[in-house]
């Protein structure tokens, strides 16, 4: 019996990190996990040791280091291949639970809908790098591109966060299309933090309670 794999998706500023921290505190006491199961909290890019180095390279805001769209796609894919091999698959095989800030559908949204790379090319690459590991549940925290920018106005942006509102709107629309196609749980991230957390917890209980 494998563990469970949960992914939180959404554009920057939607509150993924805050909610993952809250859910990570709650899940081990929820009664959902096995007695000997551990909870692994991770992220993309940067979930593995190699991934941390790739993250610095991918998100470097130095314009002289900006990769081409195809190179960017392949860097994210390399990060994911290592992430699955070294972190996700081993944890699930041990019946541990994994909660990740982003997974493969972020690549479809950002590099596919945002960068206009052919979606079938991305899907073919992802079918290799994911190695058969796909989320048991994906939750999409939805906010507008305008709200995302407003929330991040006092932070120093990385390269992806510096792309501007037009790019972000395309990515967000991509996420909405993917969410509809794959029947994700969509939660409005304009609510207060507690309301969002409660909705996520209810979703987890409905999905995984025996």
Swiss-Prot record:
Record Gene3D superfamilies: P-loop containing nucleotide triphosphate hydrolases
Keyword ATP-binding: yes
GO cellular component: cytosol
Assigned EC number: 2.7.4.9
One GO MF term: ATP binding
GO biological process, alphabetically ordered: dTDP biosynthetic process; dTTP biosynthetic process; dUDP biosynthetic process
Enzyme class per UniProt: transferase
Binding positions for ATP per the UniProt entry: 10-17
Catalysed reaction equations from the record: dTMP + ATP = dTDP + ADP
Pfam family, one: Thymidylate_kin
Keywords: ATP-binding, Kinase, Nucleotide biosynthesis, Nucleotide-binding, Transferase
Cross-referenced NCBIfam families: DTMP_kinase
Family matches, as HAMAP family: Thymidylate_kinase (MF_00165)
Biological role: Phosphorylation of dTMP to form dTDP in both de novo and salvage pathways of dTTP synthesis.
Family the entry assigns: Belongs to the thymidylate kinase family.
Stated name of the protein: Thymidylate kinase
Organism of this sequence: Prochlorococcus marinus (strain MIT 9515)
